[in-house]
Amino acid sequence: MSAAPASNGVFVVIPPNNASGLCPPPAILPTSMCQPPGIMQFEEPPLGAQTPRATQPPDLRPVETFLTGEPKVLGTVQILIGLIHLGFGSVLLMVRRGHVGIFFIEGGVPFWGGACFIISGSLSVAAEKNHTSCLVRSSLGTNILSVMAAFAGTAILLMDFGVTNRDVDRGYLAVLTIFTVLEFFTAVIAMHFGCQAIHAQASAPVIFLPNAFSADFNIPSPAASAPPAYDNVAYAQGVV
């Protein structure tokens, strides 16, 4: 270390070049700062960050599967069959008033069966317009009931053919039997596509998306030349 007097009476103390007591230690960057810019994923989310969540992308397979069966057409056919049942049932009820022997009329099959067909057809038409899971499941449930009602109605109609001897009654029963069998197959087709749509919706993939934090920040590059070292210490005159 050397001391040189200045012209104004101030001593300037210059430490040697190899002295390391006054030199600051080199800056050490953390390991995470040395990563290249990009997308960094943290195992532990930082405080206040959103936790990873499982999201399900919109899947169009259930809708396409359900629409393949033309639910609007099937529903319209079911509504027409239900109205035919109500109409022919009312006619038979008035014609056979005071007479017994037709179980199809005495059991009210054309009325509760026709109402079931109309409800299932209406839900099928509504499910094609809105594509909601609730409507698809409701349509499936009512179609199952329609299949059961059509099967029971067909069995009762076949029994009535052996009971009545009037040609007029047999004609009405024949028409009702044809439309009841048609309703059975229509409801089975609608039920088939409804089951496929629900199965496709249940097997839709779930994608797990972890939190991704952007790290597109620029790390300052080291300077080409070191800045000048300010290693001169000035002492005022008379200060020890």
Swiss-Prot record:
Keyword Membrane: yes
Gene Ontology terms describing biological process: cell surface receptor signaling pathway
Coiled coil, from the record: none
Transmembrane segments: 73-93, 100-120, 144-164, 173-193
GO cellular component, one term: plasma membrane
Membrane topology type: Multi-pass membrane protein
Cellular localisation: Membrane
Cysteines joined through disulfide linkages: none
Location (main, coarse): membrane
Record key words, sorted: Membrane, Receptor, Transmembrane, Transmembrane helix
UniProt function note: May be involved in signal transduction as a component of a multimeric receptor complex.
Family stated for the protein in its record: Belongs to the MS4A family.
Protein name: Membrane-spanning 4-domains subfamily A member 15
